[in-house]
Structures are given as C-alpha cells and as structure tokens.
Amino acid sequence: MDASVRSVSAHTGRSTSPGLTGLRVALVHDWLTGMRGGEKCLEVLCRAFPDATLHTLIHRRGALSPAIEGMTIRTSPLQRVPGVLRHYRKLLPLMPLSARSWKVGQVDLVVSLSHCVAKAVRPPRGVPHVCYCFTPMRYAWQGRDAYLEGWSDRPIRRALAGAMLNRMRTWDRASAAGVTHFVAISETVRERIGLYYQRESQVICPPVDTDYYAPGSEERENFYLCVSALVPFKRIEQAILACTRSGRELVVIGEGTERTRLEKMAGPGVRFLGWQPDDVIRDHYRRCRALLFPGEEDFGIVPIEALACGAPVLALGLGGVAETVDGAVGRTYATPTAEALLATIDAWEAEGLPHDPALARRRAEALALPVFRERLLGHLSEVVNGQHPAHVPPAPHVPFTSRGQKNVR
C-alpha cells in the first residue's frame, strides 16, 4: 500500500446508500487541512460512501471530523514536501502536476468537490464524474487580481505570477472536460461555470446544521457581529470602519493575516475574539443585534447559520448571499464600501430594526443537512441511472507544461 494512504482499512469502495447500493465510488477533494464549509459537504459524502477511497493533495492528520478521518485517504506527492501544511497555497503552480498522480482505479462513480484542481481527476472511460463545484479555480479567474496583490511590491515576480496564472487558466478550462456532470453551490457559481467552461450545471446549495444552529432563549443585545477569516477579500475592514465611525459595538470572531492591520484601525467599541469554537459562535449569533457580512462569497454559509439562529443579516448584495438574504430577513446593499454599509445600518435602525426571526429560521431550514443529502444523493443516483445525460464538449486535455493561450476570457 502506498505510503500516502492515511487509513489502512481494506475498503472495497462500495456504497450502501439507497439508489447507489453496491457502487464502487471514488471521492476527490482539493486538500484536507481543516473543517470548513467545503469539508462539511465532503462529510455528507463520506457518511454516504464510507468504503470509498478519498483522494486529495495533502492531509493534515486529525484536523477533520471522525467521518472524514476514518476514510481511506490517498495523498499526492505534495504531502512529502517539507512544510507543505503551512505553505501549501504557495505551491499553486505544482498542484496541476500533483493532481495527475490521482489514480482512482476500477470504480463506478467519481465525485470531486473542487475549487482548485480536484475536478482534474481522470475517471476510467465511461465512468461518470460528477463535480460539486464550489467555484471555478479562484486563482485563475475571479480571484486572479487578489492573488497578484501579494506581489504588488515585486514587479518581476508579479509578472511571472501573472504568466503562470494565464497558463493555469488554460489548464483549468481544459481539465473541466473530464467532468461529465457539474453541480454548482449557487446560481452565482452556475453562471461562472457557464462563462468559463461553457458547461451547464445544476444548483444544490451547501448544508447548514439547523439542529445545532437554532434560536436560543437569549435576548438580543446591542453589538453587531462579524464571523470570518481575516483575509483581504472578506472586506472586514468595512464593517470595522462603519462601526468605529458611528460609535457602534462590533464583535469580530476569526483569525487571519489581516488581524494586526484591522486592530490598528478599530475603535474602542470593536472587540476581536480570534478563533472560537462553534458553541461560542452560536451564542453570538443568538445575542447579536445583527450579523454584518461585507464580503462577496460564492455562497455564504455564515449568513445562513445566523439566520438559523434567528439573527438579522446586513450583507453586501453580491454573489451567493444575494440569493439567500433579502429585506424580509435583513438588508442588502450594492456598493462594497464602508459608507454603503454604514448607510444600511443607519436606515435599518431608523426603521425600528424590522426582522422576522421565524421567517429567517424557515429560510435556513430549506438548506438543512437532510435536504442537502437527499438532493445530492438523489442527483448522483439519477446520473448513475442515466437520467442526466452527460454534455461534455470535445476539448482535449492540455498539460500544464504547455504554453498558455492568448485572449482567454
């Protein structure tokens, strides 16, 4: 057995899920370094296919749920790179080549969960490959400029990184041809799949644990809340500036590279709690005046958790959040600035804090774990049984070592 196998169980890879009984299944995930929204989707599939082999680039042992850690996990050659678990994002240029090491063997179904290279796995001829797509490769498409910002003070390296991303974009588009069926996490992502890959997809939104995230008996307090990684594209500085300028209280839960900079701009009413466990986050959802969500997300699971706890949500009305948050459960605003967020807070408070907790709860319950499981497994069953014919354009596989195309959208 390969040294990269993290579980030595002699699994057969066969499913015991209704409608999928007896199938040999391979699961593919970009990397396994912690339990985030994507890993919660993966966990559902691991429970449905406990004997499947799980392929990934790298695996941080003990960082995932028992359902995931109990799988047979096969990693790529990147796992053997010293320090990879701390610096894996810097190894982006090596990821397409590493993905070529995935060999799924004789299986009946391949399911990838991808925002980077997982969809590049190649199934045996005639085997359906369903990709649950969090977004097309972020670094090559809509996140390209943000990735290059890290090299703004090094023009030569920035130019080289830009050329690399152009080649990555070409490779990413070609690798999509190995997917027989795309499933998008939101209408926003469905549109990107159509734009970048010229492919149709079905939308199945990610799950929220509405049994855990539920209203409590706590009274609403005066503080606003942000729950987020403290990284640039989350735009947490806009919430901090809006609350600092208006003298409002704000609690920020989360860690990231931006924390020091954000703390310097924050007023006395802003408190940083750092990383917190789920029970602390749930407690703050139950007590906050409202959740502030200034980032543009592919879907946005945090607002749904807040809604499940009965909290209002004031969010930037772009991306996936615009599909779940509206005036009935909070407010949205169109311009990604601190001024626009502050104006939204002022207007909402002037209206008397209108909010319907029961409606917010129902909105979240439509995305509960059992709903997600039923929809996703039902879709997989229909694919396997030929009810969703594949529509794959005749695009050849382009090795990452080839020269990038010009004028790629």
What are these regions (language model features)?
Residues 51-119:
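Active-site donor-binding segments of glycosyltransferases and PAPS-dependent sulfotransferases
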Residues 286-298, 311-312:
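Acidic donor-binding loop of glycosyltransferase active sites
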Residues 283-288, 376:
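Short alpha-helical donor nucleotide-sugar binding micro-motif in glycosyltransferases
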Residues 149-182, 190-191:
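Membrane-proximal helix-turn-helix segments that form the acceptor-binding/catalytic region
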Residues 336, 352-381, 388-389, 393:
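A charged, aromatic-enriched C-terminal amphipathic alpha-helix characteristic of glycosyltransferases
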